[in-house]
Regions:
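Intrinsically disordered, low-complexity N-terminal extensions of AAA+/P-loop NTPases
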Residues: 1-215, 222, 234-298
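Short acidic alpha-helix initiation/capping motifs at coil-to-helix transition points
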Residues: 52-60, 343, 357-359, 375
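Hydrophobic/aromatic beta-strand patches that form the interior of the parallel beta-sheet core
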Residues: 217, 243, 316, 335-337
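Conserved lysine of the Walker
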Residues: 227
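Conserved catalytic/switch belt of AAA+ P-loop NTPases
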Residues: 283-335
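Conserved AAA+ ATPase "SRH/arginine-finger" region at the nucleotide-binding site
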Residues: 319, 334-354
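Conserved AAA+ ATPase small/helical "lid" subdomain
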Residues: 348-351, 355-375
């Protein structure tokens, strides 16, 4: 298609990448000559002993990533093509010339031919519930119908970094979670809810001993009641590594509920088998619907329900309000705790501790009465 223009190439970049001389543009039977030249070039490439790629590091990283996430061969081949499309605009342009204004079925057929893989396996690998889409490695532009609209690069990984930095699981984990900050409160600071706190701690302890799946605790309550601190304390009490799912990316831009659901799935895969506790703060981003749009959780209701029954790494979910959550979701949590406000006496002691006795008794008392004052 790129040589069908009456005045020459549709794309000089593609012609150059294919090794076609500019003189061919002036030939009367240009399409016929181009087909012959490309056929010969393809034959020589197939016969050569050249390796699949000059990008050794990139190939190693793709293989390591596929192995860690247990991608099957078809998924790995699709991911590999998507990486090269992302870092090579000329390749993307060429593929769009081949697949322009096509439906999804035609796209899958083209991809199956390119990768020499069964159509059914290609279609299955690109399903929303499979790893490539589920982990946010790839995504689909629902408003376009060109080749690259069906094979968009996702938000989880930086394709350019795969080409210049060795892959590490630690780097991948940092893309979706951060180590939780050490708690600034002590276990004794939650004496006002001691019975429930001990119940949750003991329940989690038993869950780790028995390797139980589908363990989820929901903490909710007004800001300043110590929900996040309590989650960190639970991890400390049980000698667990604690990780928090971020609500912002590396550039401090807020990320949406759909991407956060992708991140939690990837984090579960990476942390499976470890003594870890996963904290999902500000879950309103995922569960809250608006008048005109369903929440990310409502849009994937069956999946969320299944996730809450089978997640391998125990989780603490934190919200200021559960009024936005469907009752069907609430019933899936093992324990739901409404976190009461810290007693004023306890708040006053914390204020004095943080202020290093530089405030008067009246100032301390005033601050302790502020419900929005966080620990």
């Amino acid at each position: 298609r790129f040589c069908g223009h009456r005045h020459g190439w549709f794309s000089d970049e593609i012609a150059s990448a294919l090794g076609l001389p500019s003189e061919v543009e002036q030939v009367d039977e240009m399409p016929k000559m181009v087909k012959a030249l490309l056929g010969e070039r393809y034959r020589l490439l197939k016969q050569s002993a050249r390796s699949d790629s000059e990008r050794v590091l990139l190939e190693q990283n793709i293989a390591a990533l596929a192995e860690r996430l247990q991608l099957n061969r078809v998924e790995m081949l699709i991911l590999r093509l998507a990486v090269y499309m992302q870092i090579d605009p000329t390749l993307k342009e060429a593929l769009n010339l081949i697949g322009r204004q096509i439906d999804r079925r035609r796209f899958c057929h083209l991809l199956a031919e390119m990768l020499n893989q069964p159509f059914a396996e290609i279609r299955a690998a690109l399903h929303d519930k499979q790893k490539l889409m589920r982990f946010g490695l790839l995504q689909t532009n629902r408003h376009g119908r060109d080749f690259d609209d069906y094979l968009c690069w996702g938000d989880t990984l930086d394709a350019d970094k795969l080409d210049i930095q060795p892959f590490s699981e630690e780097t991948l984990l940092k893309r979706v979670v951060q180590p939780s900050m050490p708690a600034g409160l002590a276990w004794s600071d939650f004496e006002h809810t001691a019975a429930m706190a001990c119940r949750i701690r003991d329940y989690l302890h038993h869950a780790y001993q028995t390797q139980r799946k589908g363990v989820n605790i929901l903490l909710y309550g007004a800001p300043g009641t110590g929900k996040t601190e309590f989650a960190s304390l639970l991890a400390h009490q049980l000698a667990l590594s604690c990780y928090t799912l971020g609500s912002a990316d590396e550039d401090e831009d807020m990320i949406g509920g759909q991407r956060r659901l992708q991140n939690v799935q990837l984090a579960q895969t990476l942390l499976a088998g470890q003594r870890a506790l996963l904290v999902f703060d500000e879950v309103e981003d995922v569960f809250a619907s608006s008048l005109f749009q369903l929440s990310a959780a409502q849009s994937h209701k069956a999946w969320v329900n299944q996730f809450l029954e089978h997640n391998a790494v125990p989780m603490v979910w934190i919200s200021n309000d559960v009024g936005c959550m469907d009752e069907a979701f609430l019933r899936r949590f093992d324990i739901v705790l409404h976190m009461p406000d810290l007693p004023q006496q306890k708040k006053a002691a914390l204020v004095e501790q943080l202020a290093h006795q530089r405030l008067s008794e009246g100032e301390v008392a005033y601050l302790a009465k502020q419900q929005k004052l966080t620990p």
